[in-house]
Amino acid sequence: MKEQKLTTENYKGTRDFYPEDMRLRNYLFSVMKDVVRSYGYEEYDGPMVESLDLYRAKTGEEIVGKQIYNFIDKGDREVAIRPEMTPTVARMVAKKLRELPRPIRWFSIPNLWRYEQPGHGRLREHWQLNVDMFGVTSSRAELEILSLACDILFAFGAPKNSFKVTISHRSLLDEFLLDGLKVSPNQAHEVSKILDKKNKITQDEYVALVTKTIPNDSSAVSKIDLFLNATVNSLNQIPGIKEETLAAIKGLFEDIKTIGLSDIIHFDPSVVRGFDYYTGFIFEIFDTSPQNKRSLYGGGRYDNLIGLFSNEELTGIGFGLGDVTLQNFLTAHNLLPNFASDTTVFIPLLDDSSFAENHNFAKELRKEKISAEVSLVSQKMGKQLSYAEKKGYRWILLRGEDEIKTNTVTLKDMASRNQFTFSFSEALQKIKEELSK
């Protein structure tokens, strides 16, 4: 009976990263890290597996109930593969709360898991830049986070009109629903979930869900629509909104003018965000391209996460940017560069007697931080050149019979197809000069 072979397909909703894919991923990570480090943020990481209770506390019903990967470990503990990073960073900060200098500025790019239907911009495993600041209560923290979030896209070459930022405040919706519409806390919670998915359902479905949730108010839909269309200046006409909340929103938008982003940052009370831990300002960044018109990433202020672990509260604010949505954005706006191979110099082996000297040449190149691969098998020149071309090598460093006689090397530039005969030191200098351009 023929042995059944294992499938070569990867698990649904995940990706295999071949070398060319890793070049793209490393590029995305490198640009993001450069930007956040320029703001003074430090990198951290945490475990992929956490206690399930960590996510039950504040992550949100849909993720914990339907999307989380959880299991019972061999010690009979309920654990989960992390679906997000904010609960982990809050736990880590709380663990060393008295030792850490404030404000705390941290970032990480973890891989996260959610069991959901894969689609455009959505996979079961993805990597996400998480940026968090702890210990600053003033709206200057919002200004820094918003500026940083925009600077990441600018660093990839995104023009200002390629994305927009929408901002609201978590208290707005709560105050409107509880004090304006006079609904119960449970009804308010259900309405917020409906609004969070409003753009993903039809208008009829939206009306039906609101009517079912608030059956005793026939004008609930029109009142909610009035709220959703409010501007900063018309918010005082919405019932239930407190003066303190109004002042905070107006103050933030006055401050936004000072950082030169008022043309792309807009007020939008429909911004909800699905996590239960947000308590203050919340924001979403949207792609404006018709080919990729969707939310790219978002974040907000959370004031009660540290208190889950400690008697001391510490305010936090942050955002998360996924690699899949970022790549889709860069593709839609034609912002991805052509990635050349990391490989630089290939040294063919034409005769076994040359191997030791070729090996020594490669060592000298590597000392200069120039990657070099030495052929280990003596083969026909055409076959070795074909291999080097497929691998994307920039230069071929060749030592045939003529070069051995004259103690020289032939350096072939695979980009221009030009070749030169030098001493090895001259060839090394030529490569260094070209790499520095």
Curated annotation (Swiss-Prot):
Keywords, sorted A to Z: Aminoacyl-tRNA synthetase, ATP-binding, Cytoplasm, Ligase, Nucleotide-binding, Protein biosynthesis
Keyword presence, Transferase: no
One function term, GO molecular function aspect: ATP binding
Enzyme class: ligase
EC number per UniProt: 6.1.1.21
Localization terms from the record: Cytoplasm
Protein name: Histidine--tRNA ligase
Organism per entry: Leptospira biflexa serovar Patoc (strain Patoc 1 / ATCC 23582 / Paris)
Encoding gene (name): hisS
